[in-house]
């Protein structure tokens, strides 16, 4: 039972132009979706790595962690519930929105939304970086790292 990689990140922000510019020109991401309330980006063959929700706040919306096996979702849900953390099973329509086969979600003690996802979808179209880039490796390694600030009393 293992968490394999940081699969995707969601940010609450209504500054779509700023995020579009920054993600493509600075991070080299490919913008893949733009709607009234959502902005999405790729950084490899995975369908979606970064989502801007359109909600006000300019803060973390969610962190999505990939698990190795579908059974890992039940394993982690059980562990969390034993520690009195409320876990939710996502409906298939919600999993589709995240481009994963299945997922559970919960809030950490600081109130950050954490999602554990199984089998992220790949895109059949090749990744097209937003700027010239080389040596860009993600894939099975995921997005990299995430640092989440917590109150000192939480440590």
Question: Where are the regions that the model predicts?
Answer:
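Short acidic/glycine-enriched loop/turn segments that link adjacent beta-strands
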Residues: 35-38, 59, 97-100
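Vicinal oxygen chelate
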Residues: 5-15, 55-152
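Short amphipathic beta-strand starts and helix->beta connectors
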Residues: 46-50, 129-131
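Core segments of cupin and vicinal oxygen chelate
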Residues: 1-48, 149-155
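Active-site beta-strand termini and strand-to-loop segments that position acidic
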Residues: 41-46, 55, 106-109
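Short helix-capping and inter-helix turn/linker motifs at the boundaries of alpha-helical repeat units
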Residues: 1, 54, 136-137
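A structural feature that tracks compact, well-ordered secondary-structure segments
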Residues: 22, 29-32, 51-55, 62-66, ...
